[in-house]
Amino acid sequence: MAAHCQVTGAQPGFGHSISHSHRRTKRRWNPNIQKKRYWVPSLRRNVTLNLSAKGIKVIDARGIDAVVNELIARGEKI
């Protein structure tokens, strides 16, 4: 599963882990991506989305129909 939220666009952040002696090693901060399935009444089918925790909250606040219509307008594969 790709570390990318379909609603918010959250992607991994990159940087360094810094030890006590200040040695730097590469690391990445992954977003909290969950695979969620929603019933979309306007499409009359289930839709599976890769969402961050914030993306799930956005759907709870705005509604699945509004978010899916925005994704379709953006050209996102659903």
Curated annotation (Swiss-Prot):
Pfam families: Ribosomal_L28. Residues 1-30 are annotated as: Disordered. Keywords: Ribonucleoprotein, Ribosomal protein. GO terms for cellular component: ribonucleoprotein complex; ribosome. Residues 19-30 have a biased composition (Basic residues). InterPro entries: Ribosomal_bL28, Ribosomal_bL28/bL31-like_sf, Ribosomal_bL28_bact-type, Ribosomal_bL28_sf. Gene3D superfamilies: Ribosomal protein L28/L24. Transmembrane segments: none annotated. GO terms for biological process: translation. SUPFAM superfamilies: L28p-like (SSF143800). GO terms for molecular function: structural constituent of ribosome. Belongs to the bacterial ribosomal protein bL28 family. This is Large ribosomal subunit protein bL28.
